[in-house]
Swiss-Prot record:
Pathway: Cofactor biosynthesis; pyridoxine 5'-phosphate biosynthesis; pyridoxine 5'-phosphate from D-erythrose 4-phosphate: step 5/5. The record marks E161 as: Transition state stabilizer. Coiled coil: none annotated. The lineage of its organism: Bacteria, Pseudomonadati, Pseudomonadota, Betaproteobacteria, Burkholderiales. It comes from Albidiferax ferrireducens (strain ATCC BAA-621 / DSM 15236 / T118). This is Pyridoxine 5'-phosphate synthase. The gene is pdxJ. Belongs to the PNP synthase family. The active site is at H44, E75, H201. Its main location: cytoplasm.
Length: 252
């Protein structure tokens, strides 16, 4: 099984939004990443549009029409603005392949926890059904908790995205091995229930290979902050290729 790399472009938009010049270009960044071999593009449009804006989502969807073998993943809280943003693309028959539901509060600094079951089940079930009616795959942002995977499966999710910040924070410490073991156990629980496994948050060139090697069945990693930071030094193409090598190392 090959683990796919989806590049999150939020930080490109964040830099662009500090001026009114349109640079750096989000669509240019996407093009360079796709040309370098990235398997997909991820964005997380927040209600305050502090980085990715609704226009960016449309422009990227238009761009993705030229890359039919790659995927467009849109993250966000379906209780806020996500469903409206996605519906706008669906109405125009623009490509979007996966929605990742994230339980962020409005104005939250960054994603920092997953959905809770059974507490969130009644709110999520109709939203997942709506996304499925639009022909989209649904992934739920989840903490590494094997017992919670049954809840994700019960509400109709297709995949879970494991929130990897606890692993990243433990990297290089005595907690690294226990964290990897917990993520591996969670992935096995998800796979046993027929869920696909994605992962993301603070994965980087240092910790990615070990994660891929230890955690079974990871279909996709979504990486933004570290990858864009590396691209400031190395360029988009070299950076994407470096991350693809990390994935290949983890799979070897």
């Amino acid at each position: 099984m090959t683990t796919k790399l989806s590049v999150n472009l939020n930080k490109v938009a964040l830099v662009r939004n500090t001026r009114h010049l349109g640079i750096p270009s989000v669509t240019r960044a996407a093009t360079l990443c796709l040309q370098a071999g990235a398997n997909g593009i991820t964005v997380h449009p927040r209600p305050d549009e502090r980085h990715i804006r609704t226009d960016d989502v449309r422009d990227l969807a238009l761009l993705m029409q030229a890359w039919p073998d790659r995927e467009f993943n849109i993250e966000g809280n379906p209780l806020h603005n996500l469903m409206d943003v996605v519906h706008g693309l669906v109405e125009k028959k623009l490509p979007v392949h996966q929605v990742t539901f994230v339980p962020d509060s409005e104005g939250q600094f960054t994603s920092d926890h997953g959905w809770n079951f059974p507490g969130d089940a009644s709110r999520l079930r109709p939203l997942i059904a709506q996304a499925h009616a639009w022909g989209l795959r649904v992934s739920l942002f989840m903490d590494a908790d094997p017992a919670a995977m049954a809840g994700a499966q019960a509400v109709g999710a297709d995949r879970v995205e494991l929130y990897t910040e606890p692993y990243a924070a433990a990297w290089g410490t005595a907690q690294q091995t226990p964290q990897l073991a917990r993520f591996a156990e969670t992935a096995r629980a998800a796979l046993k229930l027929g869920l696909g496994v994605n992962a993301g948050h603070d994965l980087n060139r240092d910790n990615l290979s070990a994660f891929i090697q230890a955690v079974p069945g990871v279909a996709e990693v979504s990486i933004g902050h570290a990858l864009i930071a590396d691209a400031l030094e190395l360029g988009y193409s070299a950076t994407v290729q470096a991350y693809l090598r990390c994935i290949a190392q983890g799979r070897s």
